[in-house]
């Protein structure tokens, strides 16, 4: 992921199977799917914590650990259901306690993350928790991400994280149809320290071309929603948030990588 020095994937595949997920168009999916649809499989990367410790120890010896910005995860959810069984994410966090990087960003949509708030809090400002909340409408969630936790569950997880002193970013990524700018915006501000807004066109890594090959165009058409390629709603929400919280609101890639660039010194 541009802007970060490393990414970390405790699992291959993701059972949340979001209809818009760009990973379904990636080489990772094509290599590992075995003919299965995106969202129907997950493979635990057993031994990932041991490999992580080796890598972090090397960075430590080279005095490079403070300049490491790690994103967990860009092609899976580290707290999907398999984590209850395999605990790979928890194992990795224990390694990060031993070798804390300059920045660790944890990206999830799962309330299971609350299990590990003790470790995240112990990492202090080195750890950011990103919680995906793309809309405030449950009807939209049920159509586009039916296997994901409810919006209310995720908002409550964000509030609990803040109570534990964990810096929490809500990622409206991608921005899905929502009830209204002010209503959704206020809900986000009540629950997170920062907010990142993204769109299909700005955020799928292909100017919308990847999204065009997913189920999204058909789902939007059948639901009677506006053109999925329009960025008007996402930009309106971002503008409203920017007026309220300034640079604590971020847009697309720049928003995701702002803290990472301050650690790594990378321009992009």
Region locations from a protein language model:
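Conserved Radical SAM active-site core
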Residues: 1-128, 136-139, 151, 163
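Hydrophobic faces of well-ordered beta-strands that scaffold small-molecule active sites
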Residues: 70, 104-106, 129-131, 168-172, ...
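Active-site beta-loop-alpha junctions enriched in small/polar residues
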Residues: 75-77, 109-111, 132-136, 173-175, ...
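A short secondary-structure junction signal
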Residues: 84, 118, 141-144, 173, ...
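A general structural detector for well-ordered alpha-helical segments in enzyme core domains, enriched
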Residues: 88-92, 116, 150-157, 183-188, ...
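A structural motif corresponding to the C-terminal end of an alpha-helix
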Residues: 95-102, 156-168, 232-252
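Conserved strand-turn element in the central/C-terminal portion of the radical SAM core barrel
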Residues: 147, 157-180
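Auxiliary Fe-S-binding modules of radical SAM enzymes
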Residues: 180-268
